[in-house]
From Swiss-Prot:
GO MF annotations in UniProt: translation elongation factor activity
InterPro entries per record: EF-Ts_dimer_sf (IPR036402), Transl_elong_EFTs/EF1B (IPR001816), Transl_elong_EFTs/EF1B_dimer (IPR014039), Transl_elong_Ts_CS (IPR018101), UBA-like_sf (IPR009060)
Protein name from the UniProt record: Elongation factor Ts
Function as written in the Swiss-Prot or TrEMBL entry: Associates with the EF-Tu.GDP complex and induces the exchange of GDP to GTP. It remains bound to the aminoacyl-tRNA.EF-Tu.GTP complex up to the GTP hydrolysis stage on the ribosome.
Keywords of this entry: Cytoplasm, Elongation factor, Protein biosynthesis
Family: Belongs to the EF-Ts family.
Family annotation (HAMAP family): EF_Ts (MF_00050)
Region (Involved in Mg(2+) ion dislocation from EF-Tu): 80-83
Annotated source species: Ectopseudomonas mendocina (strain ymp)
Record gene name: tsf
Compartments reported by the entry: Cytoplasm
Amino acid sequence: MAEITAALVKELRERTGQGMMECKKALVAAGGDIEKAIDDMRASGAIKAAKKAGNIAAEGSIAVRVEGGRGVIIEVNSQTDFLALQDDFKAFVKESIDEAFEKNLTEAAPLIASRESAREALVAKCGENVNIRRLTAVSGETVGAYLHGHRIGVLVVLKGGNDELAKHVAMHVAASNPAVVSPDQVSEELVAKEKEIFLQLNAEKIAGKPENIVENMVKGRIAKFLAEASLVEQAFIMDPEVKVGDLVKKAGAEVVSFVRYEVGEGIEKAETDFAAEVAAQVAASKQ
């Protein structure tokens, strides 16, 4: 068996990114053969990645890329926000968004498959579950993007206008989180639900009032709801005296669509019982 030197351990550590003790153990198990040690570590890394796959990943990063009338946005999840700020994770996210854009992908599945080996390697190195969650691609006359830190990303498609206007609208979407572009896109189901909520919350106030008065109150609330939910009806964050729709119209443009991603939205996060977790770790250490 070849001698396990400090230089050999260092080389393996540099090539795999694993800890010193893990590298030394791998070299001993491989009889000092560094290439075999790397293969063995990759295999165990895949096993580790499979084990980590059951852990909830609700943190992470949003990435966007826009060029030549095309835009792509992706969400990549991690278990902690700490990992999302690390260089290895950032590199994985950048490589993923670049591949998605350059291959002109329109859904996440092909990207997930293509990036699986890189994902497994990252999981093995960082010890956290990592997932590419979703991807949306858009195209149009004018496509703008805005990234707020690493947690909120927006793509906006305009008919007409320019890049600056599209970016400003994207910034507004990031801050105001509209549900739809215009009031006519709000579903009847959502309107009915809002009406029901209004009647429940104001049951005492409307009790005994004439039906036509109640109906007018409901209409007023629904009109306000539609304005709040619709991008073009919202007051522009950079100039509240102007509606977004009027701002865009004045520039001879029209909002076609938008996509807004926020890290972890819709993912149910696990409630961590730290006392139980510590107790479990102590019990495991005694075995």
